[in-house]
Amino acid sequence: NFAINLLLPCLKKHNITIFLSTKVGKQTNKPTALLELAFYEQELFNQVLSPKINAQHSEQTGFKTFEQLHKIVDGGVRELNNINTEEGFNLFNSSQPDLVISIRYGVIIKSNVINVPRNGVINLHSGILPNYRGVMATFWAMYKKEQRIGMTLHYISDGTIDTGKVIDKSSIDVNYQKSYLWHVLELYKEGTQLITNAVNKINQNLTITSSAQEEGGDYYTFPTTAEIETFINAGNSIISELEVNEFINQYYCFNVKLSELTQHE
């Protein structure tokens, strides 16, 4: 949601349809810390805060909830987890996309979907490719004590993961006084600018240049409980309630007490 709101200014002259997947990755029985992270990334906003924002701040000046976005974008906001089925493909195809922008879409899309938009499918990956492919790249970069972390904008040209031609990269310094989630959100500010640059080139009928990824790199999955403990014992944190509170206040113009953030409704 945050990334979409950041992109709205550059997309305002275009017809937009937003398709959502309900999860990213297939792992079940996740460590407790990752379940808590999922609450702060998804349930807190979508199930707890969004209804309150919608009810109390229908005219608020902050970023929009998905319900509010549904009312202002041409194609609305729709859940689409089965994009590779005939029914899902037909729904996707009905939006007649010229460009698909993928940000944490939790389904590996197949060639029939990839071939629809004439400007291709571009994906914003929260890691520097090819070094950090897979999920939670920012976590793994911090786990390895990297001093800089980044995002990669690349094409999706087949069903493989994080292997397409690279359009651009961005990076920021790591602040180990801040949480993993804080860094993910900070990266979206830089990453969405990469998308904006690409969209602007399309608007000007310019070619988006890209290059094949370098050889090497590693593919990462969700961390285990032991790996999360190592991360925490090194002085890092996954989530900071104070940071989340400040984020909501700053971008969604909604004041909420810390006690409300921790009520897993």
What is each of the regions a protein language model found here?
Residues 1-265:
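One-carbon transfer enzymes
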